[in-house]
């Protein structure tokens, strides 16, 4: 069983809730805030994340990519302590996202996210892309960027994502489809 919880209640750049149907078609349960996909801008959490975290299976929590989004996760840090050895906390970077503009900026954001979430990141996921404009060169540039962030933060790179039709070589490349609307 795979459950995705949308805790990204601050930044609407990628809205997990937009993909409710797609998750369901693939057997993934999506738990989202009460007002997700409405015109109301109310950061309200209407589910028991502590209980959900003890369910069988895998739990993925989307908290967004900045320290503001990590605040919501910080509320649950104490409840997650008993599971700390089982938690992978991925710092997802995208060389082409405005917050990841440079190695220094991207590396400096990590301690802020960790402070707000009251948790420590365990690895980097390199998701450098330009959407449908992504090329093999884009991915290669992202790999170099992620390697520099890895050196600066001391975190290992867990994987690099790439679209299936982009041929790129490297360690731990995960080919995935683009579902962004």
Predicted regions: what they are:
Residues 32-38, 57-72:
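Switch II (G3) loop of P-loop NTPases
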Residues 43-50:
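A short, well-structured juxtamembrane/interface segment
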Residues 54:
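Catalytic phosphate/metal-binding cores of nucleic-acid and nucleotide-processing enzymes, i.e., regions
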Residues 67-170, 174:
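Conserved catalytic-core segment of NTP-binding enzymes
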